[in-house]
Amino acid sequence: MVGSAEPVVCQFYRLIPGAPEPRRADRSADGTLPVNAYRYCEAIASASSFGWYLYPPLSFSLWWDGTEIAWTYEGADEWYPLRGAQYPNFRETFQKVAPDGLGALAPPFLVQGMLPGVVQIWSGYLARTAPRWALLSRGAVNIPKTQGYENFEGIVETDTWFGPLFTNVRLTRTNSPVEFHMRRPLFQVQPLLRQCYQEPSFKVSEVADIKEDDWQRFADTIKPNTDQMRVLGHYAVDTRKRLRGGL
C-alpha cells in the first residue's frame, strides 16, 4: 500500500474471489536466505525484495508423464486431463460481474503450452502499470527451486496491455506430482521503466581509460575487504544509509 502523495506504479485487480493478495517481496527471500546473506549481503537482499510475489489462487498439482499433463486440486476426487482449465466455478462468477458482451471472456486458470511440459498458470489478477512502466515476470528471486518446475521470464508492457497476470512454467519432473501451494510464491513481478530494456547503450573501454577518480572509487571499494578485522556488511550499512538519505 502507498500513501496518497506517492504515485502508484502498479495496480492489481483481483478477479478470482479469495485469491491471495500480491505481497511485496521480502529481503529474506520469503524466509529462505541464510542469516549471513540476509544481514550482510545487500546485493542479494535488495534483489530478493525487488517487486511483488504472486501466488496460486488455489492449491493444486500437476502430473506429467513426458507426453500428457493431468491436474487436480485441493478437494477434487480425481485427476483431470489438462488442455485448458477454468478455476472452479469461475466462469459463472465472471459472467455475473463482466459488462454485457464480455461474459464469455473469462481467463482460463491453466493452459497447456505448445512445448512439452509447459503450462501457463494464472494468478487470478489483472495488472496495470503507470505510463512507460512494464512488468518483468520471473521465478521468485533467490528462493530455492525444489518443486519440480522452472518459471520462464518475460516482460509485459502492462501500461498498454491489460490482461491476465500469469506465468509460464516448464515441468522438470515426470511421473510424480508437482505441487503448487497458495502459501508459496508462484512467481515474482518487478517494475521496469521501458528505457531499461529497449537496447540501452553501452561502451567497452580499456584499463588505460580509467580516470583518477574512478581508481579512487575502486580503492574505496576494494581496500576495506583486505582488512581482516573489518566490520562485516560495511557495503550493506553504507547502502542503507544512502537510501535512507534519498541518494
Enumerate the predicted regions with their spans.
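Non-catalytic terminal segments and appended small domains
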Residues: M1-W161, T172-L247
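Active-site cofactor/co-catalyst pockets and adjacent glycine-rich loops in catalytic enzymes
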Residues: P164
